């Protein structure tokens, strides 16, 4: 009965959230811009009040604080740090947006995602790609495929690339294990970049036919980087992320019971010392970036706080309202009857499209670890077969690209694109792009790698 009540509540929260995100910016864009915070408060109350009535106020407060302190705080600080540092790096030169250059930029950005994270790569490459294609009219497809590849799929090779893999690393999966996903990544890149090239070639020819021409910059180098020293601060942030997965395993950061030490907040909620260290390093990197970079670089980048503010407000509501669904998953995950790699791939991916992919990954990794396999990858949760772990990893990382809310960089890229006059698809419009181009690729992934 409790599970039924929780399930009904979670479905209502998810439905209301998605409808609000999808419809309100289209029907009342001015209202949405002014009242995002009110909408978030409403979503949160729709979860908190029934939850408090059913489980008690202390449990409701603990659940919300656990979500905000344990998940949201480090999440938004990481986004903030990368947003600040990347905003102080400007790539410029004589490169102009055409199909070949765009394919190369997307390919490079995709590989960068595994080196500095999908968020870091997105924030680093989004502005140059927008600027290179500023002369073009037909360009929304460029940013959609940017989200597909750079903001999501490219993060599959290392725990730095995407938080679910970092969660796997903290549960005993070796740091370089995810390099096994390289063939899957290459196949996806080939398929999606081929599709993109043909789409971009048609759009490019339309722009040329209409008389649009890029500005030719004479005596300009092919690529010039302003604020290149900020790459050091990106390295600082990457180190902070790695430490967040390494430090909790060390005995120096554990008490006698083996729990990670930290500052008690409320009941079982604790702000851990490794999280504090991660936050401090990231904020220091952001501060140093602003202190050591001339303001003119940010001006040339058209740097504003609008995108990060929108994401911060939006995702605090998402993190809170997804809690009932995650609770149902944790309690019923082992009874879902999902036992094969291809089932794990689609189940993890479908939920990662609308919920935070990190806890979703953990739920299915825990489920797989509890199946008493005798061969595979040894984790702290149990033995998980290689193919099943590949399926869970790919589902969580790849299918965050299915919606704007599947992964934080998605909405950041959308917001920055909107700020720069690119008419991005609506919430459901973007899902239609995913259905046309991503799902067929994922079906091919399933047939080749997970059956």
Please name every model-derived segment.
Residues 1-9, 14:
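Single conserved hydrophobic/aromatic residue that forms the stacking wall/gate
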Residues 10, 31-40, 61-73, 175-184, ...:
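Interfacial loop-to-helix junctions that mark the boundaries of transmembrane helices
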Residues 50-52, 113, 124-138, 142-144, ...:
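Membrane-interfacial helix-loop connectors
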Residues 138, 157-158, 176-225, 398-451:
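Juxtamembrane and boundary regions of transmembrane helices in multi-pass small-molecule transporters
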Residues 236-363, 367-370:
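Transmembrane helical segments that form the transport core of multi-pass membrane transport proteins
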């Amino acid at each position: 009965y409790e599970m039924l009540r929780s399930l009904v509540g979670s479905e209502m929260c998810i439905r209301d959230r998605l409808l609000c995100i999808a419809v309100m910016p289209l029907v009342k864009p001015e209202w949405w811009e002014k009242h995002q915070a009110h909408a978030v408060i409403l979503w949160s109350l729709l979860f908190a009040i029934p939850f408090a009535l059913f489980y008690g106020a202390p449990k409701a407060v603990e659940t919300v604080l656990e979500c905000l302190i344990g998940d949201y705080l480090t999440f938004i600080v990481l986004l903030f740090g990368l947003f600040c540092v990347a905003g102080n790096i400007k790539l410029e030169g004589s490169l102009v947006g055409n199909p070949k250059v765009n394919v190369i930029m997307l390919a490079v950005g995709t590989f960068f995602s595994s080196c500095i994270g999908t968020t870091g790569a997105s924030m680093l490459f989004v502005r140059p790609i927008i600027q290179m294609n500023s002369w073009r009219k037909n360009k929304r497809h460029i940013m959609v495929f940017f989200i597909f590849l750079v903001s999501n799929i490219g993060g599959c090779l290392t725990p730095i690339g995407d938080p679910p893999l970092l969660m796997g690393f903290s549960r005993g999966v070796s740091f370089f294990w995810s390099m096994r996903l390289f063939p899957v990544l290459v196949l996806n890149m080939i398929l999606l970049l081929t599709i993109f090239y043909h789409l971009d070639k048609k759009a490019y020819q339309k722009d040329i036919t209409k008389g649009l021409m890029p500005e030719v910059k004479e005596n300009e180098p092919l690529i010039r980087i302003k604020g290149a020293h900020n790459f050091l601060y990106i390295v600082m942030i990457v180190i902070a992320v790695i430490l967040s997965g390494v430090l909790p395993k060390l005995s120096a950061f554990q008490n006698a019971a083996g729990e990670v030490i930290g500052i008690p907040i409320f009941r079982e909620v604790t702000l851990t010392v490794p999280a504090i260290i991660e936050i401090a390093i990231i904020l220091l990197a952001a501060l140093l970036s602003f202190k050591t970079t001339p303001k003119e670089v940010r001006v040339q980048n058209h740097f504003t706080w609008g995108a990060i503010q929108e994401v911060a407000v939006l995702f605090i509501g998402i993190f809170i309202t997804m809690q009932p669904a995650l609770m149902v998953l944790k309690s019923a995950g082992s009874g879902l009857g999902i036992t094969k790699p291809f089932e794990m791939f689609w189940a993890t991916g479908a939920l990662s499209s609308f919920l935070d992919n990190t806890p979703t990954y953990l739920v299915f990794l825990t489920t797989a670890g509890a199946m008493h396999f005798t061969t595979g990858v040894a984790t702290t949760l149990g033995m998980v077969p290689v193919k099943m772990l590949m399926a869970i990893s790919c589902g969580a990382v790849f299918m965050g690209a299915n919606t704007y809310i599947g992964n934080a960089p998605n909405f950041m890229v959308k917001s920055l694109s909107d700020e720069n006059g690119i008419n991005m698809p609506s919430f459901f419009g973007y899902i239609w792009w995913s259905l046309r181009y991503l799902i067929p690729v994922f079906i091919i992934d399933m047939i080749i790698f997970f059956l």
